[in-house]
Design a protein with these regions (language model features):
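Extended surface/linker regions that mediate inter-domain or inter-protein docking
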Residues: 56-179
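Bacterial Sec-dependent N-terminal signal peptides
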Residues: 1-37
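Short amphipathic alpha-helical surface micro-motifs
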Residues: 26-32, 43-44, 66-68, 122-124
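Low-complexity, acidic Ser/Thr/Pro/Gly-rich terminal tails and inter-domain linkers that flank the onset
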Residues: 36-55
C-alpha cells in the first residue's frame, strides 16, 4: 500500500511526467541568427581545399571552403585574414621516406637576421594574388607567383645555396593557407 494521500506530481521535488497523448506539439526552437562577423568570432575553423590547379602561366589557383565548428559557413573572410604558401617535395638520396619541402615563395634574409652571417633564402607566404569570395563560405585564390617565372634575385640566391627552385610537375606539391 502506498499510504494514501494522493501526492501525485504535486509533492515537493517531483517533476510532472510527459503530457498526455493528443496535446499540442511545442514549436521547434528558433535557431540563432548567424553572426555578421563569423570569421572573427569563430573559435574553430574547418578549411577544405576543394581544387588546386595551375593556370596557363603556371600560377597556382586554389578553391577552398571555410566553416566554423558548427559547420556554419564563414562568409566574411578577406585577403587581410589569410596568407598562402606553395612548395614542392624534393627527394633525398637517403631514400624515399625522406625529403625536404622547398618553397617557391621566398625572400632573401640579410646577414645578421637570425644566426646567419650571409644572405639566406627564406620561405615565406604571399597575399598579393587575386582573392575572390564565391559566396556561401567558398573562396578562390590565384597566386601572384608563377612557378616557372620566379624573380632573378631569388633564383640567383637559390643557386648560390645549391637549391633548385625549378618547377617539376612530377614532384609532390603542397598548397597551404595560413589563417
Amino acid at each position: 500500500a502506498c499510504g494514501g494521500g494522493g501526492g501525485g506530481d504535486s509533492a515537493p521535488g517531483v517533476q510532472p511526467g510527459p503530457p498526455p497523448p493528443g496535446q499540442p506539439i511545442p514549436p521547434e526552437p528558433i535557431p540563432p541568427v548567424p553572426s555578421a562577423n563569423p570569421y572573427v568570432e569563430a573559435q574553430v575553423l574547418n578549411a577544405f581545399i576543394t581544387a588546386a590547379t595551375l593556370n596557363d602561366i603556371n600560377q597556382p589557383v586554389i578553391e577552398f571552403q571555410l566553416s566554423d565548428g558548427n559547420n556554419i559557413a564563414i562568409t566574411d573572410l578577406t585577403l587581410d585574414d589569410v596568407r598562402f604558401v606553395v612548395s614542392k617535395l624534393e627527394s633525398s638520396p637517403l631514400g624515399n621516406l625522406t625529403g625536404t619541402w622547398q618553397s617557391y615563395i621566398n625572400v632573401i634574409a640579410p646577414p645578421g637576421v637570425g644566426p646567419g652571417t650571409v644572405p639566406e633564402l627564406q620561405g615565406t607566404s604571399e597575399r598579393d594574388g587575386t582573392f575572390t569570395n564565391l559566396g556561401g563560405g567558398k573562396y578562390s585564390y590565384r597566386y601572384s607567383t608563377s612557378l616557372t617565372d620566379l624573380p632573378a634575385d631569388i633564383l640567383q640566391q637559390a643557386k648560390a645555396q645549391g637549391l633548385d627552385l625549378s618547377c617539376d610537375p612530377n614532384l609532390t606539391h603542397r598548397v597551404a593557407i595560413q589563417f
